[in-house]
């Protein structure tokens, strides 16, 4: 089982994981609100491979655009900023999963910057099979 992880440098209780309890229906609405397009997504919240955010081909947006729109919308919703630190693609059971490692920053109410890392999982099978 692949799990996302969140490494905090001292203040775990103050930093929420990027996706937290956001469900796919709410995620679609967040992306529409913050990015201005109706992303063709389904699945889970991306915290594990088993709950990966499924990005469907819509013939308009490439997967990177959709991934960044999702991450941007989630960050704005949680008042976080993030950077992509790395990523990988794995094929498991005929499906393709992209993991994106994020560096996350949050300024707490006292003005201190809290930092951590989290991996978000995307199912990009439709894009990989149609290459």
PLM-predicted stretches and their roles:
Residues 35-36, 80-81, 101-105:
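Short amphipathic alpha-helical surface micro-motifs
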Residues 61, 81-82, 90:
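Exposed, flexible binding/inhibitory loops of compact, secreted disulfide-stabilized domains
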Residues 73-83:
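Short secondary-structure junctions
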Residues 2-8, 34, 79, 94, ...:
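Generic intrinsically disordered, low-complexity segments enriched for polar/acidic and small residues
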Residues 1-72:
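N-terminal trafficking/processing presequences and adjacent post-cleavage segments
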Residues 85-131:
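Short, compact, well-ordered microdomains
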Residues 13, 80, 129-130:
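Amphipathic alpha-helical interaction segments
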